[in-house]
């Protein structure tokens, strides 16, 4: 069942060269909410895409310090999830963009 909380957990798919390379290993990358846990990410992907998830790995990329016109600012931290799907399952993230 699709719950509105699932849409808050999965922010967007990651579409980079490296993310397309891991699709050979039946994996998909998503930007997720910073406070999302692995079980929440697994439940959200299974509910939204109707697939079976084998494993979830998460990465937190720390935000960089940037300067703009002499003012120092900081980019936000980003949490990324690498979702491994069960064999025979697939998600096409290029559709619906």
From Swiss-Prot:
CC terms in the record's Gene Ontology section: ribonucleoprotein complex; ribosome
Q: Which InterPro entries match?
A: Nucleotide-bd_a/b_plait_sf, Ribosomal_uL23-like, Ribosomal_uL23/eL15/eS24_sf
User: Chloroplast as a keyword?
Assistant: no
Record-level GO BP terms: translation
Which superkingdom is the protein from?
Bacteria
The alphabetical list of record keywords is:
Ribonucleoprotein, Ribosomal protein, RNA-binding, rRNA-binding
Q: What does this protein do?
A: One of the early assembly proteins it binds 23S rRNA. One of the proteins that surrounds the polypeptide exit tunnel on the outside of the ribosome. Forms the main docking site for trigger factor binding to the ribosome.
How is the quaternary structure described? Part of the 50S ribosomal subunit. Contacts protein L29, and trigger factor when it is bound to the ribosome.
Which NCBIfam families does the record match to this protein?
PRK05738.1-3, PRK05738.1-5, PRK05738.2-4
Q: What is this protein called?
A: Large ribosomal subunit protein uL23
Q: What organism, scientifically named, is this protein from? A: Bartonella quintana (strain Toulouse) (Rochalimaea quintana)
Output the lineage of the source organism.
Answer: Bacteria, Pseudomonadati, Pseudomonadota, Alphaproteobacteria, Hyphomicrobiales
Q: Which gene encodes it?
A: rplW
């Amino acid at each position: 069942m699709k719950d509105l909380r699932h849409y808050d957990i999965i922010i967007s798919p990651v579409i980079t060269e490296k993310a397309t390379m891991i699709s050979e290993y039946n994996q998909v990358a998503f930007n997720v909410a910073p406070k999302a846990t692995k079980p929440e990410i697994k439940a959200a992907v299974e509910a939204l895409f109707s697939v079976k998830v084998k494993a979830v790995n998460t990465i937190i990329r720390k935000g960089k310090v940037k300067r703009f016109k002499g003012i120092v600012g900081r980019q936000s931290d980003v949490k990324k999830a690498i979702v491994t799907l069960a064999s025979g399952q697939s998600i096409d993230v290029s559709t619906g963009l």
